[in-house]
Regions:
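Well-ordered, non-transmembrane segments within structured domains
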Residues: 56-63, 71
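Binuclear metal-ion centers of metallo-dependent hydrolases, dominated by the metallo-beta-lactamase
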Residues: 65-145
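A short, acidic/glycine-rich surface segment
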Residues: 44-46, 64-67
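Thr-Gly-centered strand-to-loop micro-motif
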Residues: 37-38, 58-60, 80, 111-112
Length: 145
């Protein structure tokens, strides 16, 4: 309720104006890039990830249904959250994310949305299977058109 004044039926002059654009399924960006949504769960909250050609970005989840997993198979690059080693109510653990990455079979998976509790970058990367790595500040991923 911190910013509830923004959502009042009669807006107050000078407050931010929001144009809602609900997205679901497949849509095109203003630059004509096709994007597909992936419905995932963040504890009890439905959230979405995105697929851009053979690249997917799913960074706030702890559950993905079997039907939505199908959308994530055959990717070149998957970016997935892996918060820490210990269980968490709304995020994949390192072990859960690793198992999911193996199941989905992307050519390269990067884990992101990690806490300091996951361990040292170099140590964790040494534990991960080939094709799965921790993301890092400044990582750049080239996406095909």
């Amino acid at each position: 309720n911190q910013f509830d004044y923004i959502f009042q039926p009669v807006p107050y002059p000078g407050i931010p104006q929001i144009d809602w654009n609900l997205i679901d399924g497949i849509f095109q960006t203003p630059a004509k890039h096709t994007v597909e949504t992936v419905n995932v769960t963040h504890f009890k909250l439905p959230v979405i990830g995105f697929i851009f050609n053979k690249f997917a970005y799913v960074t706030d989840a702890n559950f993905i249904s079997e039907s939505e997993k199908e959308k994530l198979k055959g990717l070149d690059v998957l970016v997935l959250n892996a918060l820490r080693r210990e269980s968490h109510i709304s995020h994949f653990t390192l072990a859960e994310a690793t198992a999911l990455a193996i199941e989905l079979g992307a050519k390269q998976t990067y884990f992101t949305h990690m806490s300091h509790q996951i361990g040292l970058h170099e140590d964790v990367c040494a534990e991960l299977p080939e094709g799965i790595d921790l993301a890092y500040d400044g990582l750049s991923i080239d996406l095909p058109d």
